[in-house]
């Protein structure tokens, strides 16, 4: 199970703004009609997904530099997903194939408002079997930002690989970005999910959570600032709470505020948070003074809100990720 050679190593080594994304990539099966159960769905659209991979693709589509570290089944779906990464401009040298496990699948139920529920087929799937010894630490240490979620924390050996990768990044002075991306059906219990997600909380420099995730993690009202600030810790540079179509809230040690969202025709919210994160990481990688400059941060968050909104207007995550031009067009229309 050697790393894939895709010829991107030299380019990544020379790229000062590389974002390395760690975790899972899978196939989402999205129903062709919203508002019905999985059993009632007449057909499904096959779409690549998995939050860390979506973030990597979002970064590349916006002109940034990204790489993905993770494991895939040595099956048609696995090879298809790695090809999709490459076609989207993502460095795939940190990807591995496992001949003994399948690529993960998820069936997505779309509610009439575009919100989702998930049913997963991944026990075990190849992404869960990545080991510490298989990590491409050279790639990780070349990054400016190391980004990850929490799904890779659920089971061994991937949990140990995740922690080792994160610590290698931190020891190299690389910024750590955390989007927990809570998926309760994958955890043994709600308590296990909460404990697992919070177990690495204070390793991050930047954390993005949704309002629903704030409510879950704090067991309180996400609109109550006291609950949000209970997630703050000394050393954190930026905490973002996304509030769906309402936009987002931001917190740093020096300032806080909110940035309104954009009104669009929402079809499927899959990948919206990943488009938001990817677009923000592109800007942080270019200029990390964003953490200390509120005007720059607000401009970046306006752009990220636009990217997240655009992603909800099509089914699937990666196919719906916007370009800079499309995001700027939405911002310009909203200003007029």
Curated annotation (Swiss-Prot):
Keywords: ATP-binding, Carbohydrate metabolism, Kinase, Nucleotide-binding, Transferase. GO terms for biological process: fructose metabolic process; starch biosynthetic process. Predominantly in roots and endosperms and low levels in mature leaves. The keyword Kinase applies. GO terms for cellular component: cytosol. One of its GO terms (molecular function) is ATP binding. It catalyses: D-fructose + ATP = D-fructose 6-phosphate + ADP + H(+). PROSITE patterns: PFKB_KINASES_1 (PS00583). Strongly inhibited at high fructose concentration. It comes from the Eukaryota. Pathway: Glycan biosynthesis; starch biosynthesis. Its EC number is 2.7.1.4. It is an enzyme of class 2 (transferase). Gene3D superfamilies: 3.40.1190.20. Belongs to the carbohydrate kinase PfkB family. May play an important role in maintaining the flux of carbon towards starch formation in endosperm. May also be involved in a sugar-sensing pathway. This is Fructokinase-2. The lineage of its organism: Eukaryota, Viridiplantae, Streptophyta, Embryophyta, Tracheophyta.
């Amino acid at each position: 199970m050697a790393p894939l050679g895709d010829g991107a190593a030299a380019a990544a080594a020379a790229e000062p703004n590389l974002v390395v994304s760690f975790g899972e990539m899978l196939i989402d099966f999205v129903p062709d009609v919203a508002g019905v159960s999985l059993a009632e769905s007449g057909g499904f659209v096959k779409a690549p997904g998995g939050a860390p991979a979506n973030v990597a693709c979002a970064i590349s589509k916006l002109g940034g530099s990204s790489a993905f570290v993770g494991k895939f089944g040595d099956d048609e779906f696995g090879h298809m997903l790695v090809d999709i990464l490459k076609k989207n401009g993502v460095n795939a040298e940190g990807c591995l194939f496992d001949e003994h496990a399948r690529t993960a699948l998820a069936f997505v139920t779309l509610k009439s408002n575009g919100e989702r529920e998930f049913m997963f087929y991944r026990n075990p799937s190849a992404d869960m079997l990545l080991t510490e010894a298989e990590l491409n630490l050279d790639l990780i240490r070349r990054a400016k930002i190391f980004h990850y979620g929490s799904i890779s924390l659920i089971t061994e050996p991937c949990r140990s690989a995740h922690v080792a990768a994160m610590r290698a990044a931190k020891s190299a002075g690389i910024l750590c970005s955390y989007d927990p991306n809570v998926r309760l059906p994958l955890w043994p219990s709600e308590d296990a999910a909460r404990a697992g997600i919070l177990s690495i909380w204070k390793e991050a420099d930047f954390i993005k959570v949704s309002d629903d995730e704030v409510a879950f993690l704090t067991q309180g009202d996400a609109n109550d600032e006291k609950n949000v600030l209970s997630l703050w810790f000394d050393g954190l540079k930026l905490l973002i709470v996304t509030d769906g179509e309402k936009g987002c809230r931001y917190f740093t040690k020096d300032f806080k505020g909110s940035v309104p969202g954009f009104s669009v025709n929402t079809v499927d919210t899959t990948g919206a948070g990943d488009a938001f994160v990817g677009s923000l990481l592109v800007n942080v990688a270019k200029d990390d003074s964003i953490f200390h400059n509120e005007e720059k941060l607000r401009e970046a968050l306006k752009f990220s809100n636009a990217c997240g909104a655009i992603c909800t207007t099509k089914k699937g995550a990666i196919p719906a990720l916007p370009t800079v031009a499309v995001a700027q067009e939405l911002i310009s229309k909203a200003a007029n």
